Amino acid sequence: ELAKENIDLLLTMNGSPYEEGKTDTRLDLAVRRAAEVNAPMLYLNQVGGQDDLVFDGGSFVVDTDGTLLERSPMFMEDLSFFDLDTSAEHQKVGTIAAKPDPDEEVYTACVLGLKDYMAKNHFKGVCLGLSGGIDSALVAAMAADAVGGENVYGISMPSMYSSDGSKDDAADLARNIGAHYDIQPIEPLFVSFQNQLELEGVAAENLQARIRGVIVMAYS
């Protein structure tokens, strides 16, 4: 029906949350719609974190032949201008922001979600355990990118099984991202529990994690 109206532009406003690979799906859908209505399509998308959702922005314009005419950056607010020539058969290509690579895209989505969640809930900092492993290193880097290293509080909680290498890596990480750093050995607490409970196997391993959780919550 819109194709019969001879419209100049189809405008669609969206609050479409981020999913990996979704930008290509949106573009494919917009290309089909622009061809159906025989008019360029402007796809506007919300940007920012809201609770457990992240909106990635990346608004764009496509022509009737599927040409990408304009694209805003992902994961940031942006003001851009696109000139629509209603007398032209096809539009001129404007500014097209580069797409991040897949790993950078997911990382940036996590950082934006954390940053906006903290801001909207008036949280002042991030407190987390630093084991010296890749898991906590990645989360700490995200936190530093979201709120600044000076607002990140890293806690090393070594046990009798922790290697010197792991301890050194945790300290190096905190220094590299500019985070606060403290050491809280869990061996005395672990020994106290074991003297009473005499746990073995998985139960003993889980005890270390529970002790570390209590320490992080206490700091938080």
Feature locations, PLM:
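Enzyme catalytic cores with a strong preference for nitrogen-chemistry domains
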Residues: 1-129, 145, 149, 181
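Active-site adenylate/phosphate-handling loop in enzymes that bind or generate adenylated species
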Residues: 3-6, 147, 177, 197-220
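ATP-dependent adenylation/pyrophosphate-handling site
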Residues: 11, 124-130, 134-171
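Alpha-helix capping and helix-loop boundary segments enriched in small/acidic/polar residues
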Residues: 21, 25, 50, 101, ...
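Short acidic, glycine/serine/threonine-rich loops at helix termini
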Residues: 21-24, 53-56, 137-142, 156, ...
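Aromatic/hydrophobic pocket-lining residues that form π-stacking "cages" and hydrophobic walls in ligand
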Residues: 30, 170, 216
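A conserved beta-strand->alpha-helix junction
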Residues: 76-83, 151-156, 160-201, 209
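Catalytic-loop motifs flanking and including active-site residues across diverse enzymes
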Residues: 106, 139, 212-215
